[in-house]
Regions:
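Long, intrinsically disordered, low-complexity segments
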Residues: 3-53, 120, 125, 162, ...
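Flexible, polar/acidic helix-loop-strand segments at domain edges
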Residues: 13, 63-130
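Extended, hydrophobic/aromatic-rich amphipathic alpha-helical segments that build helical scaffolds
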Residues: 16, 75, 79, 124-161, ...
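Active-site rim segments in enzyme catalytic domains, especially the processed small/beta chain
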Residues: 42-58, 62-69, 76
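Surface-exposed, flexible loop/turn segments at secondary-structure boundaries
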Residues: 86, 146, 203
Length: 249
């Protein structure tokens, strides 16, 4: 959890970050400064934190109970990734579960004036972490058949991740590798791309869950971006004529 605090930006576990600076951004001047509004998006509305650490936001992107439950007993990443707020401490919004993302949550003192406070948080976005290096290596070796490099053992890499989280070692099976990435990177924007890369998106991103007001379908062709119409027009009638990806219109 400490890695996501302001004083630990650019620490040894964080290889590359997008630096966010609260420099007076406002609704009328969105290009002023480099503050981020992500903390406002994902924090519960009208939050009253008894400990005075976290602030309220707009209440988007609540965490599902299944994500909270996927962590093993004693896994420090659960409470470092998810805030669980009691009823009465915030105003429920769409798809409310009482669970919210913690890593980039709105924190007291992270959005000083001037400018609009919701647009000026200084939470740096961690783009690439050491943990991703380890789990990428494990996946390449165990799921994609690549040879180990310079004697670096895939099991040992996975053990590093698990030891830091305070849980026992597990075997680097495909199922375990996928689950470990989900646990490690919750709330960091990795999950969608992992599912697409593994070919799991059509299954796991297609659902009909009235409890979450979620009805959606994901098909294989959707992993490709649509080609802009203007670009296709430029090549029309040539030997290099562009054709639209999938069923994009």
């Amino acid at each position: 959890d400490a890695m996501w605090e302001d004083e630990n930006e650019f620490c040894k576990e964080s290889i590359f970050e997008s630096n966010q600076l609260p420099e007076g951004k406002s609704w009328g001047n969105a290009w002023s400064g480099y503050g981020t509004n992500l903390p406002a998006f994902i924090s519960p509305a009208d939050l009253k934190d008894p400990d005075g650490i976290f602030k309220g936001g707009w209440g988007f992107g609540p965490v599902r109970q299944a994500a909270y439950d996927m962590y093993e007993q004693g896994d420090k990443r659960r409470d470092g990734s998810i805030n669980k707020w009691d009823d009465g401490l915030y105003t429920p919004r769409f798809q409310n579960t009482g669970l919210f993302q913690r890593k980039y949550a709105a924190r007291v003192g992270y959005n000083p004036p001037p400018g609009d406070v919701d647009l000026n948080y200084c939470n740096n976005l961690r783009i690439f972490r050491y943990a991703e290096t380890l789990l990428n290596y494990v996946e390449l070796v165990k799921m994609h058949g690549q040879s180990e490099v310079d004697g670096v053992n895939a099991q040992a890499c996975l053990d590093q991740i698990r030891e830091r989280a305070g849980v026992s070692p597990i075997q680097p099976t495909e199922e375990n590798i996928k689950l470990e990435r989900r646990r490690e990177f919750l709330g960091e924007g990795m999950r969608f791309w992992d599912l697409v890369r593994w070919g799991d998106a059509p299954t796991l991103l297609t659902e009909n869950e009235p409890a979450h007001n979620s009805v959606r379908t994901f098909e294989e062709w959707m992993k490709y971006l649509p080609i802009p119409q203007g670009e296709m027009e430029k090549t029309k009638g040539t030997e290099f004529e562009l054709k639209q990806n999938g069923n994009w219109k």
